Swiss-Prot record:
Its EC number is 5.6.2.2. It holds the Pfam family DNA_topoisoIV. It comes from the Bacteria. It catalyses: ATP-dependent breakage, passage and rejoining of double-stranded DNA. It is found in: Cytoplasm. This is DNA gyrase subunit A. InterPro entries: GyrA (IPR005743), GyrA/parC_rep (IPR006691), Gyrase/topoIV_suA_C (IPR035516), Topo_IIA-like_dom_sf (IPR013760), Topo_IIA_A/C_ab (IPR013758), Topo_IIA_A_a_sf (IPR013757), Topo_IIA_dom_A (IPR002205), Type_II_DNA_Topoisomerases (IPR050220). PANTHER family: DNA GYRASE SUBUNIT A, CHLOROPLASTIC_MITOCHONDRIAL, DNA GYRASE/TOPOISOMERASE SUBUNIT A.
Length: 922
């Protein structure tokens, strides 16, 4: 026990674990996982190709069963499972996995749909032609050899490849504690980069990138952006976006429907799973606008057809698919490889330099090998040439010898005349054909030639027909050609420039034989591409319904109608889903979407679904990250964010606020706070002002207050009727209880004396605002108007009556007052208001979804204290809920009569306030 105890050495378990783990990790990294930077092959790839080479499984020979190759690999070189080795062979034979296949397979080797290859007993393989370039000169001592796993065989430590395979075919995998992902490239470009580096070894990476533009994936597709490529080539790490090559076009069969055709997929994308994912997104309504999906691919080409619903934008649908599916993927580049048996992150130039250094070593070792072989052969031919020059005495010597050994000894023992050899060696040099192992006493000495035993044996083995004059000439000719070859080989070894010329010529031969001209297609990055460039600018009508459905329609969908017509249906509306917001914008405009919780979101008009008049559109909650219970209440089109412009807010409770437009110039996908609202309050209007505009607030009780948003100014006198006062002296400024809603100290107003106006100074985004109008009896503000020009104010009641009133009829007063009467309404009636010009047109929308477009010139201009005329015929339980001005530029050239409706020809004067709103004809 004591002897045994002395043999046990205590060690620290932490140190032992660390040491053992590092040994294991390096064993896996070097011996199993990482590719070598010189040949770009992992050990299993190298062993597969070597086994096929040893089997004579060449590209120009018959195929052999895959099982035969797998058996040789696992039996001699790679002691792992047969399935792992077969999977390696399968991948080397897949044209969608390898840019340049190294194995030529026959049978089912899988597909881009993820189908598995047939069992190895069914498939057959042989080396691809390009694989010979990886194994070329393997038998010329160009690389080191190492024992196999059991020491019974020798295998190459690296292949003497003529092809820069690491970049050409790429590599990916995971080792212990590290991973790598090197993309494939176009062989022509990589060779061109090598040639440029041979010409000028001081080229920078940026200069190399003029030859090597980027990865070239076997499945094609488009590399979206150069920034990731530049970063990866400079540092060894980066990422690129790979986008499917797709086209949006008109279906040839229908000549009307829009379709998306996908021709090429990103690298390593499973086509079947991609199609399943698209179908799943359509089913879950995460991607809308797709009516049909078909896979029309065959064995030669990929073709996925996506049919687009009528009215939807194919470009928008395609971009949504890029966002939500593997039609666009990220390829992370991590160029890690073994360099001198050490894992190393390498940039583009590092890899090319390592390959060229490997080629210099291979060509040098090959040249040394060929020089040795040439000298050995020339040494024999030199002896034969000397023998032929001394043929008679040599024959006489052989005839008088007792045994072959005696004849050999006599041939070696004396010197012989040089004959023709003297002239040949005088030109090439006495030692040109002298092997390194030759002792000094042999060869030319003192004007004679002393034969070696090898030469003497070759003379004795010479057949008699070689003594003819023709054969004599052939021996001398071969000897001379070997002398020339030796001179060339010596020149290669002596001249680095000539050595690089040899490498250059071999690279040119590889490019000529295997190169192709398909360059990687690299587009501008998504940040550089403006989707607006794909969208035709046009004026459209944007609608937002009560239940949150949004859409846009071309303005040309609505023809002008005579007033009193029933209009044309603008959307498929249920009773509870009437249109709440309607505006006219350009497809390139930005829509600021203001929510019930005082937040603002950004949308481009073209991001909204284009829908027909009968379609509901799409829930805006699918376009914006709205929280539960949050609803969009106001939308505002914006072209640019000027510093001298302001966003003016008005709420239903009469609060107003203005904030610089530039405060909303930085869109966030999650939205930002635009205004703090009191509980129960909501936005009813938002507009753009210049800081000194007139502001008009209209209540649902038919009242209006007009004030200047800027600094104080003297009050204008005005005449008022008894109807204007309505129980209070509304000309008196309400100076008390300003109800400052600001939560951050901004926007508070001091009490001001009578006879001055109170403006609205700019406030921060989170301010609550100040009072704009004093409301009575639960009234609500229904409209915010910023008067521009000399146009009239068009007012419409929910019963379909309306009128135009000149702006001069509305006096400028101070904010915070009750205002003056704008229109007579029923006790429970509501109104809609907008400013118009005589050349404009208006749209009226009802809660039943009916929309009518009529000319402003057909609406009477009358005073404030009147009820108006019939604008739209409403049905039973149908009320007007929206009014929108359409500028002169949208007006139709032709005077189009009412469509899908009737024109009232009876009395068109509104009934007195308080009476029934029925049509007098009824």
């Amino acid at each position: 026990m004591s002897d045994l105890a002395r043999e046990i050495t205590p060690i620290n378990i932490e140190e032992e674990l660390k040491s053992s783990y590092l040994d294991y990790a390096m064993s896996v990294i070097v011996g199993r996982a990482l590719p070598d930077v010189r040949d770009g092959l992992k050990p299993v790839h190298r062993r597969v190709l070597f086994a096929m080479n040893e089997l004579g499984n060449d590209w120009n020979k018959p195929y052999k069963k895959s099982a035969r190759v797998v058996g040789d690999v696992i039996g001699k070189y790679h002691p792992h499972g047969d399935s792992a080795v077969y999977d390696t062979i399968v991948r080397l034979a897949q044209d969608f996995s390898m840019r340049y296949m190294l194995v030529d397979g026959q049978g089912n080797f899988g597909s881009v749909d993820g189908d598995s290859a047939a069992a190895m007993r069914y498939t057959e393989v042989r080396m691809a032609r390009i694989s010979h370039e990886l194994l070329a000169d393997l038998d010329k001592e160009t690389v080191d050899w190492v024992p196999n796993y059991d020491g019974t065989e020798m295998i190459p430590a690296v292949m003497p490849t003529k092809v820069p395979n690491l970049l050409v075919n790429g590599s990916s995998g995971i080792a212990v504690g590290m991973a790598w992902n090197i993309p494939p490239h176009n062989l022509t470009e990589i060779v061109n980069g090598c040639l440029a580096l041979i010409e000028n070894g001081n080229l920078t990476i940026d200069e190399l990138m003029t030859y090597i533009t980027g990865p070239d994936f076997p499945t094609g597709a488009i590399i979206n952006g150069r920034a990731g490529i530049v970063q990866a080539y400079r540092t060894g790490r980066g990422s690129v976006y790979v986008r499917a090559k797709a086209e949006v076009e008109v279906d040839d069969k229908t000549s009307r429907e829009t379709i998306i055709i996908v021709h090429e997929l990103p690298y390593q994308v499973n086509k079947a799973r991609l199609i399943e994912k698209i179908a799943e997104l359509v089913k879950e309504k995460k991607v809308e606008g797709i009516s049909a999906l078909r896979d029309e691919s065959d064995k030669d080409a990929c073709r996925i057809v996506i049919e687009i619903k009528r009215g939807e934008s194919g470009e928008i649908v395609l971009n949504n698919l890029y966002k939500h599916t593997q039609l666009q993927t990220t390829f992370g580049i991590n160029m890690v490889a073994l360099d001198n048996n050490q894992p190393k992150v390498m940039n583009l130039k590092d890899i090319l330099d390592a390959f060229l250094l490997h080629r210099r070593e291979v060509v040098t070792r090959r040249t040394v090998f060929e020089l040795r072989k040439a000298r050995d052969r020339a040494h024999i031919l030199e002896g034969l040439a000397v023998a032929l020059a001394n043929i008679d005495p040599i024959i006489e010597l052989i005839r008088h010898s007792d045994t072959p050994a005696d004849a050999k000894a006599k041939l070696v023992a004396r010197g012989w005349e040089l004959g023709n050899v003297a002239a040949m060696l005088e030109k090439a040099g006495d030692d040109a054909a002298r092997p390194e192992w030759l002792e000094p006493e042999f060869g030319i000495r003192e004007g004679q030639y002393f034969l070696t035993e090898q030469q003497a044996q070759a003379i004795l083995d010479l057949r008699l027909h070689k003594l003819t004059g023709l054969e004599h000439g052939k021996i001398l000719e071969e000897y001379q050609s070997l002398l020339d070859l030796i001179a060339e080989l010596l020149f290669i070894l002596a001249s680095p420039e000539r050595l690089m010329e040899v490498i250059r010529d071999e690279l040119l031969a590889v490019r000529e034989q295997y190169g192709d001209e398909r360059p990687p297609e690299i587009s501008a990055s998504s940040a550089e591409i403006n989707i607006e460039d794909l969208i035709t600018p046009e004026d459209v009508v944007v609608t937002l319904s009560h239940q949150g459905y949004v859409k846009y329609q071309p303005i040309t969908d609505y023809e002008a109608q005579r007033r009193g017509g029933r209009g044309k249906s603008a959307t498929r509306i249920k009773e509870e889903n009437f249109v709440e917001r309607l505006l006219v914008a350009n497809t390139h405009d930005t829509i600021l979407c203001f929510s019930t919780r005082g937040k603002v979101y950004w949308l481009k008009v073209y991001q909204l679904p284009e829908a027909s008049r009968g379609a509901r559109g799409r829930p805006i909650i699918n376009l914006l990250p709205l929280e539960e219970g949050e609803r969009i209440t106001a939308i505002l089109p914006v072209k640019e964010y000027a510093d001298d412009k302001y966003v003016f807010f008005a709420t239903a409770d009469g609060t107003v606020k203005k904030t610089s437009l530039s405060a909303f110039s930085r869109p966030l996908s999650s939205g930002i706070r635009a205004i703090n609202l009191k509980e129960g309050d909501e936005l009813i209007g938002v507009d753009i002002t210049d800081g000194s505009n007139e502001i008009m607030l209209f209540s649902d009780a038919g009242k209006v207050v007009r004030f200047n948003e800027g600094s104080a100014a003297p009050m204008q006198p005005m005449l008022m009727s008894s109807d204007d006062v309505d129980g209070d002296d509304e000309s008196v400024i309400d100076a008390g209880n300003d109800d400052d809603g600001s939560d951050n100290g901004e926007g508070s107003e001091s009490t001001e004396s009578k006879g001055t106006f109170k403006g609205v100074r700019p406030m921060g985004r989170t301010a609550g605002g100040v009072r704009g109008i004093r409301l009575l009896n639960g009234d609500k503000v229904v409209s915010l108007i910023v008067p521009r020009g000399e146009g009239a104010i068009l007012t419409a009641t929910e019963n379909g009556y309306g009128k135009g009133t000149a702006l001069t009829e509305y006096p400028t007063k101070s904010r915070g007052t009750q205002g003056v009467r704008s229109i007579k309404v029923d006790e429970d009636g509501k109104v809609s208001i907008d400013q118009v010009d005589d050349t404009d047109q208006i749209m009226l929308i009802t809660n039943g979804g009916t929309l009518v477009r009529t000319r402003v010139s057909e609406v009477s201009i009358i005073g404030r204290n009147t009820g108006g005329v019939r604008l739209i015929r409403t049905g039973e339980d149908e009320t007007v809920v929206g009014l929108q001005r359409i500028a002169e530029s949208y007006e139709e050239e032709n005077d189009v009569m009412a469509i899908d409706g009737e024109v009232s020809e009876g009395t068109d004067t509104a009934p007195d306030a308080g009476s029934a709103a029925a049509d007098p004809e009824e």
